Amino acid sequence: GRYANARGSEPTWTPRAMRSLAEAEPSVFWLDDRSAPPALPSLVGAVEADLVVVGGGYTGLWTALHAKEADPDRDVTLVEAATVGWAASGRNGGFCASSLTHGEANGLDRFPDEFDTLERLGRENLDGIEATITKHGIDAEFERTGELDIAVEDWQVDELNEFARLLAEHGTDPVLLDREQTQALVHSPTYLASRYDADGVALVHPAKLAWGLRQACLDLGVRIYEHTEVTKITSDGAGLALRCPFGSIRGRQVALATNAFTNLLRRLGNYIVPVYDYVLVTEPLSPEQQDAVGWEGRQGLADLGNQFHYYRLTADNRILWGGYD
């Protein structure tokens, strides 16, 4: 798409690349959706709650939801500095994986003694996510399609085989597909082999999942304030006091669910490393384009590279692909 000039200075975009991006829009695909709910009011004045949840991403929403389900009489309040799902929960590829260790290979390397337990808990967690979506009637475009982990280089085929051997030692029966079997599922000449995890990955619309959890919380009586940043937390007798721009909250308990936005507890700063994720999304594929690609199973795909290496179909048959650094 671009080339460096003779002096090695900043690359120049080619005319073809410029044409292909002429109508592209640099926005968050999932959040730019006509089904986005209207913003909720900000907190103005002083309120009290049994539990205050700070952060309106998945962690905060599920914390509030489970707390209210466990004790309907508990007064639960959630505050979000922007809007629900605005940050990482609405800015990802929409792969919902059972792995708690960011991939089984990482789990085997770092937690060999606990790996089997972590895998079991991860499967139970994914089942629980699906159960919550079903219970509350959340339209999150949830598809439990599984995932193909794909080798596109010869050395990656060897890596897949070794990985399968390690999984087998832990009681897993990995499904390995050769070149012909893999290309029969997705028609790419670059695919040399794959491992198919049929049940450990689901695809979702990340923002719709967050918005659905928001509505489930509201239906149960959770108070949610958007555009309400917590600027300070101090002890207040048997509870905690939270300061906001136009109000305050006194909570008996506080759950911080702010991910990288942890300046309220500065001692956590050394444990946070930002990860930048990028995605590109095509226009909806035509029927002819869909036939050319195959991909009838709509599996999530991830090749064994380390940049733009994951891709999937959206509900309206766009191809989304992305990666992180």
Placement of each model-derived feature along the sequence:
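Active-site substrate-recognition segment that forms the wall
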Residues: 94-96, 127, 135-143, 230, ...
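Extreme N-terminal leader/targeting segments of oxidoreductases
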Residues: 1-51, 69-70, 74-75
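Glycine-rich FAD pyrophosphate-binding loop
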Residues: 68-91
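A non-catalytic, amphipathic alpha-helix used as a structural packing/dimerization or gating element
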Residues: 113, 117-131, 162
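Flavin (FAD/FMN) cofactor-binding and adjacent substrate-gating region
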Residues: 17-26, 31-33, 102-108, 131-212
